[in-house]
Amino acid sequence: MPGEFEPHEGTLMIWPWRPGSWNYGAKAARTAFAEIAEAIAAYEQVYLFVRPQDKASAQELLSSDRIHLIEAQTEDAWARDTGATFVINNQGGRRGIQLEFNAWGGQYDGLYSHFEHDREVPERICSFLGDSFYNARPFVLEGGSIHVDGEGTLLTTEECLLSPGRNPSLTRAEIEEKLRQYLSVEKIIWLPFGIYNDETNGHIDNMCCFVKPGEVLLAWTDDENDPQYARSRAAFDLLSHTVDAKGRSFVIHKLPIPKHPICITEEDLLGYDFEAGEDQREAGERLAASYINFYLANHCVLLPRFGDENDTVAAEILGKCFPNRRILPVDARVILTGGGNIHCITQQIPAKKRGNRL
């Protein structure tokens, strides 16, 4: 599996509509998704799944001829977790992987009950691209729960992959074997936790990611009274005393979380329509806001912006980590309120011929 920083053919996205995730008919969410899709399309192709009944709304907000609308039914818009994960062989052949999706926990603690259409996304995108795919089911794995360096190292969290709602019949060793088998990784590094109060059970893509092989960014706070502090400290200590698949020690860049916790307001709770059994938030609930949830498209970085003073700090740090990429801050509050962020709504489709990081 190539690193996200390697060249892409394009990016998979899904047009938002779910009334329990996106309020007031997803109007604000669609504006944010359109801004992100257009920004990515300046650098690579965008393959956007959209329900037939919502196609007109997408056409109204999108203009780039690099954005390809693909009619398909979906339950929600989290392309990172429902889309195919792609691998490349030494001859430049590309295949998707059809992993099992159970809405982040199935009957144990899943966020919604019906996800039949979400399960079809991997096969549909592979068919559209003309790629074959491996069927890895019933192994449950979301794209947001892993990060790879393209050289044999994988990052994940115990909090997520060992959650009872994922693969309760598999041991840790058996999960590692599945990851090695399908992603061709050699070393799996298990951080204990993800970001505090992450409803996905601590996805790695909110907590830690690769800048390049041997170099990572880690969500951080210096406030020892913040519940995130112990989580970040545990990850830092582990990363400081381990090596990657090639025997390299890690260079660790601390990327601060927002200085002020971002919480759900009473106003945020208006305009939703929930189905039976769907997860609902409460006013005052802290959201899992993290600048780590940026997305690396070709030649650019799409960085979530929260209206916090650390927005500028995060942009400066990423500018130093990715000097050859344009840093594009995007107002991401509406996506955060929906349950994720920029990385969660995008899934890279690697170029068939692997190359150096961009």
Regions found by a protein language model. Give the residues of each.
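Histidine/cysteine-enriched polar flanking segments
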Residues: 1-358
